[in-house]
Amino acid sequence: MYPTKFRRGVSYSQRRFVSRNQSSKRGTFVRRTDGKRRKGPSSKAHDEPKMKLQRIHENQYGPEFVMTHNSALSTFINFPVLGKIEPNRSRSYIKLNRLSFKGTVKIERVHADVNMDGVISKIEGVFSLVIVVDRKPHLSSTGGLHTFDEIFGARIHSHGNLAITPGLKDRYYVLHVLKRVLSVEKDTLMVDLEGSTTISNRRYNCWASFNDLEHDLCNGVYANISKNAILVYYCWMSDAMSKASTFVSYDLDYLG
């Protein structure tokens, strides 16, 4: 793990000659009498707080999490702050273990579509919640996250299997997909959302790193994450005039 240092121009097979009086050139050992032990180079590591398993909770809801039909939105999972108040982190990196979520999506009719027989048509559509890992987090040229269409090609792809577009596969990978195919006869419908995904396992450990350039900016927002951010994409596809409102709670288990 640690590279061996070699002397330039000297190999192990070369014979070394030692003069007889070399022993007289050895330095004299002086015992310290102050009773204090010298601190080795590893003392700094012992001064740092020990990393431990923790969980950070987050609720995502509100006006910014309401989608009209045939629309999508993107957001991120907040990571812990560098500090002493738990849940926290003691380093500029954490190990991501597991992400679980639970919540609801409410489908509402915006405008009643009446067919020729005078019957109000159903609201039929597909709701998707997609969790994505961003290996190299940084804002796009527009100053925001990549959109659903940029990541997966088009929103209509949510009807099938979602895959990262070829040009972004080196940066992103899909961690979890939750899909609900809905048919609503009433004006409103509430649907439960629940799932969990393992991020690190025995064969692979996923570590997230932070920039932490200034003391006041040692937080867990996307702009301060330098490696392995977690993004969430919501999408509601329907031909009916409707909207989808989400309320989802996330719990991130980590070592930090």
Curated annotation (Swiss-Prot):
Changing I164T: Complete loss of interaction with Arabidopsis thaliana NSI protein. Reduced level of infectivity. Residues 150-187 are annotated as: Interaction with Arabidopsis thaliana NSI protein. Changing E150G: Complete loss of interaction with Arabidopsis thaliana NSI protein. Reduced level of infectivity. It is found in: Host nucleus; Host cytoplasm; Host cell membrane. Residues 18-50 are annotated as: Disordered. GO terms for biological process: DNA transport; transport of virus in host, cell to cell. A motif (Bipartite nuclear localization signal) lies at residues 21-42. It is a peripheral membrane protein. GO terms for cellular component: host cell; host cell cytoplasm; host cell nucleus; host cell plasma membrane; membrane; viral capsid. GO terms for molecular function: single-stranded DNA binding; structural molecule activity. A motif (Nuclear localization signal) lies at residues 81-96. The keyword Repressor does not apply. The keyword Cytoplasm does not apply. Binds to single-stranded and double-stranded viral DNA. Interacts with the host nuclear shuttle interacting (NSI) protein. This interaction may allow NSP to recruit NSI monomers to the viral genome and thus regulate nuclear export of viral genome by NSP. Belongs to the begomovirus nuclear shuttle protein family. This is Nuclear shuttle protein. It comes from Cabbage leaf curl virus (isolate Jamaica) (CaLCuV).
